[in-house]
């Protein structure tokens, strides 16, 4: 996501694109990790090709003690953008859908919202009116969904929403809108000693609410945009944090590199993104000592998912923009461009 929770992108988005073994494998003497069965394919949802080979070669090279590219266990860090990289971001970011649904849910407690902007625009579903809202108006909507809440309470509301919300096109719960090939990559990396981090422009507490369930990634390995919190003592004498209506961290563009340093303190050796909002994260990965790998997902499969760029002549989009300039930089830097159409045998676990 881009630009302070990608609020400006919303104005455009509203008008576009309507059984397991119980015996552990023996340890590999070179890597210290469990040895995989020779015939096992760690990435079964990937077609054989340059992208799959690059990932497998990278993992083998960086986990083999005899390799000059060996990366010690403490430095095995992998970063993933979320929206458009690990799950669907079209026709609009999932957090926007959450905000709109939350405003509608809270509306009975605020009768004045029916006639008060920006709430009136959302409640009436007036796309033209929403398109005219200022960034200040949009931030007011976002703040209404979390201000005054503890992080735990907010995450509880998000989990409740996730349990019932469905994607508008595929009519599937959002936890099922994750890309199966990316889940396989995450597991493959973790099986080989890598720590996997989500580095997203979305709300940090929003993603923390479901990341363990969806990705197998714990809350402390989620980096995202945040609002300020204020420490207070509860009536029961317990210290707590209360969300405030002010942006603290904007985890987009260069903010991703800055926050990786802030939260992790080390550069990643492998990074995955899909848009201009991820460019600096990949650029920050590239100078790491030893071998590194940057990968970008190109959405070029309108049949199984969506097609947008505008790189390579694909339709333009303000949601997850992948420009030709970014595509050209990827080629110049040796980053791998993952074609959804050609590199992914299967996109969703339920989709054949």
What are the residue ranges of the model-derived segments?
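C-terminal motif of bacterial Sec signal peptides marking the signal peptidase cleavage site
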Residues: 16-19
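A metal-dependent, Asp-based hydrolase signature
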Residues: 92, 97-176, 180
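Nucleotide/phosphate-binding catalytic cleft detector across ATP-hydrolyzing
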Residues: 12
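C-terminal cap/substrate-recognition subdomain and adjoining C-terminal extension
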Residues: 24-44, 50-56, 60, 75, ...
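Short, solvent-exposed loop/turn and secondary-structure capping segments
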Residues: 89-92, 97-100, 209-211, 284
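N-terminal carbohydrate-binding/catalytic regions of secreted carbohydrate-active enzymes
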Residues: 58-77, 90-91
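Asp-based phosphoryl-transfer active-site loop
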Residues: 76-91, 282
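Bacterial N-terminal signal peptides that target proteins for export
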Residues: 1-9
